[in-house]
Amino acid sequence: MKIRVINPNTTASMTDKIGEAACRIAAPGTLIVASNPRSGPVSIESHFDEAISAVGVIEEVRAGELEQTDAYILACFGDPGLLAARELTRAPVIGIAEAAFHLATLISTRFSIVTT
């Protein structure tokens, strides 16, 4: 199985750390491909940054489709471009924020988000 883990910002050092973390927990035989867009914000701090980064996510999913990627993970709390990415592929596209929210609702009926 090939999983493309997409860092929606352009910070390569962060992408490397994300890829390393994913590789540590991946099942044997799973290929993790960590990627980030060629252009876009170095950090996603505003609605504008989120909108620009969504374009990069779309480009990364298109590239993944050419490589026959089996699943995608958006490694950014805001899940930028999540719904658009799902329209481009039949493969699962999981946003880490959405996944965390779903898990939180299994633990409790109420939860909070603490951010800076």
Language-model features: locations:
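Acidic/His-rich segments in extracytoplasmic proteins that coordinate ligands and/or metal ions
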Residues: D70, G78-L88
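Short, ordered loop/turn segments at secondary-structure junctions
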Residues: T10, P37, F77, E98-A99
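Short, glycine-/small-residue-rich phosphate/pyrophosphate-handling segment
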Residues: S13, H102-T116
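General beta-strand structural signal in soluble alpha/beta enzymes
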Residues: V33-S35, I73-L74, V93-I96
